[in-house]
């Protein structure tokens, strides 16, 4: 999401500023509203270019095909996702299976993993985020998030929640891991 919400709009704005006097009839409106929004806008014909931090899903590809729209995936950059916890949490590393179990609700208390005890508060991006889809695919093996996982609109919101909650865990793009009140957990 770091790329979709920040970098790509900045690059687009810089391109527009540099070419504002060029004689062409192309118009741009830049809006960073989530990967699903960009893909849907291309499929629905409301835009020619849609920004997305993930590839179109099978459902989106089928919808595009049924409407005669050919989607082209053109990568411009890559990001990574980090799992974060509050700085006071003694957990240093987790297996991918444990991360899956936390976010799907199979593990509900830190005591199941260590001497640190407290009800886990898990934070996720909302469903329109490409980061949400990537994390669900990579870490949850496409399983559903538990209903108690709180969905946030931005990486900044996840960091803010984990900063103030000693039992919090979340995932964010790498550009958001610099807060002294959180730490990145290594994944085995």
Model-derived features with residue positions:
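Exported/periplasmic ABC-transporter solute-binding proteins
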Residues: 1-188
């Amino acid at each position: 999401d770091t790329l979709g919400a920040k970098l790509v709009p900045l690059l687009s704005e810089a391109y527009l500023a540099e070419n504002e006097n060029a004689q062409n009839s192309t118009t741009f409106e830049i809006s960073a509203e989530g990967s699903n929004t960009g893909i849907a806008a291309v499929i629905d014909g409301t835009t020619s270019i849609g920004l997305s931090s993930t590839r179109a899903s099978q459902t989106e590809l089928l919808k595009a095909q049924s409407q005669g729209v050919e989607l082209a995936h053109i990568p411009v950059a890559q990001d990574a996702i980090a799992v974060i916890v509050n700085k006071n949490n003694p957990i240093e590393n987790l297996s991918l299976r444990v991360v899956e179990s936390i976010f799907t609700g199979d593990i509900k208390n830190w005591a199941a993993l260590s001497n640190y005890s407290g009800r886990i508060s898990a934070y996720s991006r909302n469903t329109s985020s490409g980061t949400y889809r990537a994390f669900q695919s990579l870490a949850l093996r496409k399983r559903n998030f538990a209903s108690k996982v709180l969905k946030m609109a931005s990486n900044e919101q996840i960091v803010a929640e984990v900063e103030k909650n000693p039992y919090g865990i979340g995932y964010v793009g790498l550009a958001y891991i610099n807060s002294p009140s959180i730490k990145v957990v290594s994944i085995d």
